[in-house]
């Protein structure tokens, strides 16, 4: 059974469309939310196409695109993210709503937590930076994010929004994540290693076991 999802989320602050396949492969949208797709696609978005993955992330915030691209790539997903947000105000609504919408898509694509490992962990270095992530597909939304970022912004993304994106994602999915940057002095490296570590942990947690059981002593995974 294909683990795919399509999410459309519209508020007064953002308009978002996400297509996700947790196992990679071909992915496409029937219709873009952008009025003129050829104008939107430029050097500021993250796109990568291979035989096993299709990734195209366009949030309007370059560094957010870069982080979500890294998350998708190392999780093994195929992912399309389109967002039109009120960036004339600031980056908050766009970053938060993309995190929420991505979480909604992940939850829909994963379906019942059954026949998967449930737990995952990962370490990822980027030069001097090293991050650790641990994931529990618990249906218990909780996020502990400690990245130690010092700059006010990386590109056009406020550093305070980087952990908030991950918190919003975990809350929308209903999972527990712990993400820590253990060392590093370059904030770009610290953030990117954190997203890559989370990707590795997620890839393990959603991997199929070949069984059809619910990975819980309770026999259920629900609030």
Swiss-Prot record:
It catalyses: D-erythro-1-(imidazol-4-yl)glycerol 3-phosphate = 3-(imidazol-4-yl)-2-oxopropyl phosphate + H2O. It comes from the Eukaryota. Its EC number is 4.2.1.19. GO terms for biological process: L-histidine biosynthetic process. Pathway: Amino-acid biosynthesis; L-histidine biosynthesis; L-histidine from 5-phospho-alpha-D-ribose 1-diphosphate: step 6/9. Pfam families: IGPD. One of its GO terms (molecular function) is imidazoleglycerol-phosphate dehydratase activity. Keywords: Amino-acid biosynthesis, Histidine biosynthesis, Lyase. Belongs to the imidazoleglycerol-phosphate dehydratase family. This is Imidazoleglycerol-phosphate dehydratase. It comes from Candida albicans. The lineage of its organism: Eukaryota, Fungi, Dikarya, Ascomycota, Saccharomycotina.
């Amino acid at each position: 059974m294909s683990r795919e999802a399509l999410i459309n989320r519209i508020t007064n602050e953002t308009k978002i469309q996400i297509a996700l396949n947790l196992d990679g492969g071909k992915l496409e949208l029937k219709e873009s939310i952008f009025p003129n797709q050829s104008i939107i696609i430029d050097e500021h978005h993250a796109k990568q196409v291979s035989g096993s993955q299709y990734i195209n992330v366009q949030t309007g915030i370059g560094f957010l695109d870069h982080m979500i691209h890294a998350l998708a790539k190392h999780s093994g997903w195929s992912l399309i993210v389109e967002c039109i947000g009120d960036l004339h105000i600031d980056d908050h609504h766009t970053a938060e709503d993309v995190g929420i919408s991505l979480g909604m898509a992940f939850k829909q694509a994963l379906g019942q937590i059954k026949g998967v490992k449930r737990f995952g962990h990962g370490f990822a270095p980027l030069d001097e930076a090293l991050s650790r992530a641990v994931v529990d597909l618990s249906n218990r939304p909780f996020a502990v994010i400690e990245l130690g970022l010092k700059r006010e912004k990386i590109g056009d993304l406020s550093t305070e929004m980087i952990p908030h994106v991950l918190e919003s994602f975990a809350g929308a999915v209903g999972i527990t994540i712990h993400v820590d940057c253990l060392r590093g002095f370059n904030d770009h490296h610290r953030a990117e290693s954190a997203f890559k570590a989370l990707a590795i942990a997620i890839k393990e947690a959603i991997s199929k076991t070949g069984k059809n059981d619910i990975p819980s002593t309770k026999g259920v995974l629900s609030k």
